[in-house]
């Protein structure tokens, strides 16, 4: 960790979505996103949907150019990881100031999305797909 980062206030948040887990740090800066040591644009393949999803909690509070986002994320795909980062950033902003909680909660940035892959059941081909039925 740089000596510059040690002197600044660091706010932590953890986010989860599907099988992705993101540990997010907010550091006072100019709005850069760094995910697993790579730039956010590069890591997310320049996908504007994922980038806007990550920036959404900061935009809700009008802080998009005030904090750098440093992320360690693992598991799942890019969409799950982007939503996990979004939730982690929102939780870190709540740590920054308790007043931030209400606007973030009304926008839905703090709630965990419970949807996950349904398990396969025995006797079926997939989670709900049954083998073809033959009457005779």
Curated annotation (Swiss-Prot):
GO terms for biological process: translation. Keywords: Ribonucleoprotein, Ribosomal protein. It holds the Pfam family Ribosomal_S9. The gene is rpsI. Residues 97-136 are annotated as: Disordered. Signal peptide: none annotated. Belongs to the universal ribosomal protein uS9 family. GO terms for cellular component: cytosolic small ribosomal subunit. This is Small ribosomal subunit protein uS9. Residues 98-116 have a biased composition (Basic and acidic residues). Residues 117-136 have a biased composition (Basic residues). One of its GO terms (molecular function) is RNA binding. InterPro entries: Ribosomal_Su5_D2-typ_SF (IPR020568), Ribosomal_uS9 (IPR000754), Ribosomal_uS9_bac/plastid (IPR023035), Ribosomal_uS9_CS (IPR020574), Ribsml_uS5_D2-typ_fold_subgr (IPR014721).
């Amino acid at each position: 960790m740089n000596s510059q980062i040690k002197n600044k206030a660091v706010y932590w948040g953890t986010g989860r979505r599907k099988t992705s887990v993101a540990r997010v740090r907010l550091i006072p800066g100019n709005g850069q996103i760094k995910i697993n040591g790579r730039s956010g644009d590069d890591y997310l393949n320049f996908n504007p949907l994922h980038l806007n999803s990550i920036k959404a909690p900061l935009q809700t509070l009008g802080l998009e150019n005030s904090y750098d986002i440093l992320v360690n994320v693992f598991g799942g795909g890019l969409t799950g990881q982007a939503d996990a980062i979004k939730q982690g950033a929102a939780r870190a902003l709540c740590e920054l100031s308790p007043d931030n909680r209400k606007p973030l909660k009304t926008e839905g940035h703090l709630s965990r999305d419970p949807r996950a892959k349904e398990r396969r059941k025995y006797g079926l081909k997939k989670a709900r797909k049954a083998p073809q039925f033959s009457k005779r």
